[in-house]
Regions:
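Active-site ligand-binding patch in enzyme domains
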Residues: 3-14, 19-159
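A contiguous pocket-lining binding segment that forms or flanks enzyme active sites
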Residues: 159-169
């Protein structure tokens, strides 16, 4: 199977951390600027973030108690055609299905709107699948209890035509 080329684009402290107080010091400002400028250099169609990063500035927090669904959605990948047509994506690694969204895409200052694709495991509740469909958020199953990264990458390529993905942090 074909998979996208993965670019690992990280801004780290000297001790290898991708988060912390070092982001707030003036000496980091030039590095943050260069980090942002390099994002577009790579020409990636998608950026993959973990649950913590999504909660830190992309998702609308965690979903609360979801209403019981009358008809259980099938446990199959779901692709929103409108979102797919956007051609720019944010892939959210959310194995348990806990992230909340206000719609099918996320728009950050200085970046084009990106369709959200949730990477889930089979453990996710049927109510969450229904919620994602109502929000227009696509989702892919990539493992039973743990995320299978190879499977996820293959599906991103096959179902969304993603050839280059950025793992950012």
């Amino acid at each position: 199977m074909e998979r996208p080329f993965v670019v690992c684009h990280m801004l780290t402290s000297l001790d290898g951390k991708i988060d912390g107080t070092f982001f707030g010091v003036p000496e980091t400002v030039p590095a943050i600027k260069a980090y942002g400028e390099l994002r577009s250099f790579y020409g990636c169609q998608a950026t993959l973030y973990g649950t913590t990063t999504m909660l830190g500035g992309y998702a609308e927090g965690k979903v609360g108690q979801l209403p019981t669904v009358m008809s259980t959605p099938p446990r199959a990948d779901w692709v929103n055609p409108t979102g797919k047509a956007m051609g720019n994506f944010i892939v959210a690694v959310d194995p348990q299905g806990q992230l909340a969204y206000s719609g099918l895409s996320i728009e950050k200052k200085g970046r084009p709107a990106a369709h959200v694709i949730e990477a889930l495991t089979e453990q996710v509740a049927p109510e969450y699948l229904s919620y994602l469909q109502n929000q227009g958020v696509s989702y892919l199953f990539a493992g039973e209890k743990r995320l299978n990264c190879t499977l996820l990458l293959e599906k991103l390529h096959r179902l969304f035509g993603i050839n280059k993905l950025m793992l950012a942090g």
